[in-house]
Curated annotation (Swiss-Prot):
One of its GO terms (cellular component) is cytosol. Its cofactor is Mn(2+). Substrate binds at residues 123, 153-154, 185, 191, 261-264, 336. It comes from Halalkalibacterium halodurans (strain ATCC BAA-125 / DSM 18197 / FERM 7344 / JCM 9153 / C-125) (Bacillus halodurans). GO terms for molecular function: manganese ion binding; phosphoglycerate mutase activity. SUPFAM superfamilies: 2,3-Bisphosphoglycerate-independent phosphoglycerate mutase, substrate-binding domain, Alkaline phosphatase-like. Binds 2 manganese ions per subunit. This is 2,3-bisphosphoglycerate-independent phosphoglycerate mutase. Pathway: Carbohydrate degradation; glycolysis; pyruvate from D-glyceraldehyde 3-phosphate: step 3/5. GO terms for biological process: glucose catabolic process; glycolytic process; sporulation resulting in formation of a cellular spore. It comes from the Bacteria. Signal peptide: none annotated.
């Protein structure tokens, strides 16, 4: 097949759901979408959970959706990547972890593990801590100390006790590990250069300074009695019977920071890894020759080893089109412009050769329910001029409305948003067809399909419903088990282009 131009049209936040109540997609008058759906081959795609590299059951979002679509493969997010490595056993063979453990065995020193002790799944997951304890046991590391950062933000504000009880039970079961300090994340995980907070955590871990308690649960009990919840627990030291700290970080020790999200892990990591650190005076007991491990790549400014190194996304659709000398256009309004450029290109800022970009300003309104059409008409007018000029072989287009207005949790404006997009969709697709081209009409995740719950409450979050895909080419059959990663291979199939090995998605065309 060799169709040109091929337009990949992403209706942001537009998924399919049988229940019409609270469903702006179902209730909207959308003659163009319905016409294409009835006339052309169509299917539903999974756009959530493990199909897009997230934990099972987790709703997709625009960043993840565009990453997967543009990459033509499942792009595993950090949480899922680590979970999978534990499940498949690679975690326990990770060279960086083993280096840290060998370091302390050779030096006769201690392994310190710190991070956010919860299952919030935003910055960390307690299961990753458990896996590290299991690994320490396997590797026969004798002295393992945990410095627990307490959450209270991505989980309940007073939930720390349940996590600490579970952790104590896990350490007892394995016969490995001891809690040495506890810190509210407000201190240990600051990201705004409030170094006085980070210093309190540092001094607890290195100097054994701070409120002292004989057990972790005493820290929690005392904090709650003083109306201090998990996030704000003052960095506290757990002591032995003789009043000495259970452990402090010393020369030749190793540290593993098990948070996977970088932003709140950078500052604490800089304290221990950077020779020219200027945030505060680390004092003469600054530990030397510490083997420091970051779970993921935190920042160029952190001089530690990385256990799960970044995966470079080579041969995304944009790069493949450039290599095969196809001209491409990326077009969206402000709200979704980064998605059709940076995220679609696998985290690359600069355009590929032969790639043109058009940014249309989003309207300046407080909230988009006040202007549900947003800038869809302006995007469409600009695109129709481009199609008429025959400049591009491939067009990547995003209509932001169903998602951005859907976030309002207001049904009527979201219906209007879907109707405006449908009007624009008709103009664009008909112009593409008139040029002898083909359109792939799809979405990145759900939202407008459930704006109000069955109980009548506003629903502002994304949904896990499947998204549509229509290929405007009669006589084709589409697979029913597709995912977002299959869209780029489908575009290449329509163009008659070659699919690279890195793209593990499969064309939807049977």
């Amino acid at each position: 097949m060799s169709k040109k131009p091929v337009a990949l049209i992403i209706l942001d936040g537009f998924a399919m759901r049988d229940e019409a109540k609270g469903n702006a997609v179902a209730q909207a008058n959308k003659p163009n979408f319905d016409r294409y759906w009835n006339q052309y081959p169509h299917a539903l795609l999974k756009a959530d959970g493990e199909a897009v590299g997230l934990p099972e059951g987790q709703m997709g979002n625009s960043e993840v959706g565009h990453l997967n679509i543009g990459a033509g493969r499942i792009v595993y997010q950090s949480l899922t990547r680590v979970n999978l490595s534990i499940r498949e056993g690679e975690f326990f063979e990770n060279e960086t972890f083993l280096n840290a453990m060998n370091h302390v065995k050779e030096k006769g020193s201690s392994l310190h593990i710190y991070g956010l002790v919860s299952d919030g799944g935003i910055h960390s997951h307690i299961n990753h801590l458990y896996a590290l304890l299991e690994l320490a046991k396997r590797e026969q590391v004798e002295r393992v100390y945990i410095h627990g950062f307490l959450d209270g933000r991505d989980v309940g504000p007073t939930s720390a006790e349940s996590y600490l009880v579970d952790l104590e039970a896990k350490m007892k079961e394995l016969g490995v590990g001891e809690l040495a300090t506890l810190h509210g994340r407000y201190y240990a995980m600051d990201r705004d250069k409030r170094w006085d907070r980070v210093e309190k955590s540092y001094r607890a871990m290195v100097y054994g300074e701070g409120p002292a308690y004989s057990s972790a649960l005493d820290v929690i009990k005392d904090s709650y009695e003083n109306s201090i919840h998990d996030e704000f627990v003052i960095p506290s030291v757990i002591t032995n019977e003789d009043g000495s700290p259970v452990a402090t970080i010393e020369d030749d020790d190793a540290i593993i920071f098990f948070n996977f999200r970088p932003d709140r892990a950078i500052q604490m990591s800089q304290v221990f890894t950077n020779k020219d650190f200027r945030g505060f005076d680390r004092g003469e007991k600054l530990p030397q020759n510490v083997y420091y491990v970051c779970l993921t790549h935190f920042s160029e400014t952190v001089q530690g080893d990385v256990a799960f190194k970044p995966t470079n996304l080579d041969n995304t659709l944009g790069e493949v089109l450039a290599q095969q000398n196809y001209k491409q256009l990326r077009i969206a309004e402000t709200e979704k412009y980064p998605h059709v450029t940076f995220f679609f290109s696998g985290g690359r800022e600069e355009p590929f050769p032969g790639e043109e970009r058009i940014l249309i300003d989003s309207p300046k309104v407080a909230t988009y329910d006040l202007k549900p059409e947003m800038s869809a008409y302006e995007v469409t007018d600009a695109l129709l001029n481009e199609i008429e000029a025959d400049k591009h072989d491939v067009i990547i287009l995003n209509f932001a409305n169903p998602d951005m207005v859907g976030h309002s949790g207001m049904l009527e404006p979201t219906i209007k948003a879907v109707e405006a997009v449908d009007e624009c969709l008709g103009k664009v697709v008909d112009a593409i067809l008139a040029k002898g081209g083909a359109a792939v009409i799809t979405a990145d995740h759900g939202n407008a399909d459930e704006v109000v719950t069955l109980e009548g409450k506003p629903m502002t979050a994304h949904t896990t419903n499947k998204v549509p895909v229509i290929v405007t080419e009669e006589g084709l059959n589409l697979r029913e088990d597709g995912i977002l990663a299959d869209l780029s291979p489908t575009v290449l199939d329509l163009l008659g282009g070659k699919q690279p090995a890195e793209m593990t998605g499969k064309t939807l065309i049977k």
